[in-house]
């Protein structure tokens, strides 16, 4: 499942965040890449322990934890702290698949990368190129969203970032370990939950809603891992 979640941050908030990112000291993005990915990665990245990365990352997660669409789709158990990158001057990241497991907190905890997310902090007209290209069951999907919007997609996806030939593309990316590791099961639960929400709005007293809601929770109980 590939899902576009709009307006995590307002235009005013994005403007302040981008201004702060533009003033930050960036490092070579290869520092956080795996052995194979490092050969394909050509971008800049904020150090993981940078105060600005922690500040914006905490604000992002607070928003997402209160966002019904993200919670319904991701069913998050744990999240790898958001990272921040900048593509400019031809920067790119060739096709790769993200590492299956990431260490956090100095290796004391691990996150399985069931889902990948990218939150854009540059508007499409601010740069040329820079499309996030994701290969899914329907072929190659090119993603270039308005600033403040997020795309959520399976961590198993082959993906790349096209070269940025003008301007700069600022974004955050992170991984989520879901309660439900299998993408097809998460997709089924998401579609059920969205249908239940629409039925609750349109026909709130329909007797089948109780049974349908119960079926959703029984499936979640069967498939979830804690």
From Swiss-Prot:
Free-text comment on the cofactor: Binds 1 Fe(2+) ion per subunit.
GO molecular function, one term: iron ion binding
UniProt EC number: 1.14.11.-
Cofactor: Fe(2+); L-ascorbate
Pfam families assigned: 2OG-FeII_Oxy_3, PKHD_C
Residue intervals of the Fe2OG dioxygenase domain: 78-178
Protein name: PKHD-type hydroxylase PLES_48951
Keywords from the UniProt entry: Dioxygenase, Iron, Metal-binding, Oxidoreductase, Vitamin C
Enzyme's top EC category: oxidoreductase
